[in-house]
Amino acid sequence: MSRPTATLVLRNAVVATCDRGPSDAGLLPGAAVAVEGRRVAWVGRDRDLEAEVNAGGAQVIDARGGLVTPGLVDSHTHLVFAGERAGEFALRCAGRSYLQVALSGGGIAVTTRATRAAPDEQLLADAAARARRLIAQGVTTIEVKSGYGLDAPEELRLLRIVHRLGDALGGDATILPTLLFHAVPPEQVGDRAGFVREACASLIPQVARERLAGFCDVFVEDGAFAPDEARLLLQAAKDRGLVPRVHAEQLTAGGGARLAAELGCSSADHLEELDDAGVAALAEARVVAGLLPLSTLFLGSERYAPARRLLEAGVPVSLATNMNPGSAMSENVGLTLSLACLKLGLTPAEALVAFTAGGARALRQPDLGRIARGADADLVLWGCGSPEHLAWHMAVNHALAVVKHGRVVHQAPAVAMVDCR
């Protein structure tokens, strides 16, 4: 077999392939990765590079003992919104709960009003700025939900903005749009059944027809959608070729996890109030459990998702930021990794795999989240030599170079380069 001709090489690295299961980062010390075009062409021992790869004309990055991982996959975000909820944050700091604030006219309703009033270009620019902050921290794939428009015209508008986001970023990240049913629009709260029927008959088919989203997500929660309502929406989405997902068991045990298992959802996210029956249902159906620890921290709760029980039951897990204005106003990747270890009980290796291969699985993207021949060349060089260091040095951006489809899309200043050997 002829040697691949590399266009980019990262060498003298500790490579984490993230392709050996949920608890093994697949660490290869003294390793190199060769990229040909948009794909990984070879990964192996650095000393074997010249014999295995034609790298004479390649761009070479000397990792100096640094960790090289797959690009992170942020599988749950709400980047498209306007306005702020700082006042609501202050109320919660004074003792009001998230549900109390929402029921008194705050919460999603505040963001919906601001988002509906904002012009497209403002929403796009703000979403792009948030995405850029994620990219600079090693995220190369971002799932982006609609959900703050609530009614059909606004949800369609938001999804079209999400579609423009990839171009606005110049291809520096893959953007995967999701149609999110966040709550019943205020104009239709008196006819919930009518809203669901209309969404199933009109909105979902239009989203599928125009290919505005690959996923459909429903917030199954008190004050949002009941399981029976969510079942109708998600089944209609499945029938139109959209992949179903759910927000489940975040604030109350509402049955969302069992619904996810019943419908074969790609993921059930949040799960702070998940019970043993829900764990068993997710395990049997092989639904990915989406872990979002920034939300638990931001809401001032100590009820984190039962990550260890999920892993021990054989449930695949993902880790994501859940960046949104109400329950996780942060794009901090490092803090997310640290919380996964400190509060969810994951090892640093498990947290890294969940943020790479786990996110790819939740989004059904088999060529993402791993370093292997033929996989997408989405890579990150970190200014440290291990997953443990990433989680230990909290809330710091350790990303030195970010590669998307074989192209360096972000590089830290030279002063940030460190020798990890």
UniProtKB/Swiss-Prot annotation:
It is found in: Cytoplasm. The keyword DNA-binding does not apply. Fe(3+) binds at H76, H78, H247. 4-imidazolone-5-propanoate binds at R85, Y148, H182, Q250, S327. GO terms for biological process: L-histidine catabolic process to glutamate and formamide; L-histidine catabolic process to glutamate and formate. Its main location: cytoplasm. Disulfide bonds: none annotated. Pfam families: Amidohydro_1 (PF01979). GO terms for cellular component: cytoplasm. N-formimidoyl-L-glutamate binds at Y148, N324, G326. GO terms for molecular function: imidazolonepropionase activity; iron ion binding; zinc ion binding. Keywords: Cytoplasm, Histidine metabolism, Hydrolase, Iron, Metal-binding, Zinc. Binds 1 zinc or iron ion per subunit. It catalyses: 4-imidazolone-5-propanoate + H2O = N-formimidoyl-L-glutamate. Its cofactor is Zn(2+); Fe(3+). HAMAP family: HutI (MF_00372). This is Imidazolonepropionase. It comes from Anaeromyxobacter sp. (strain K).
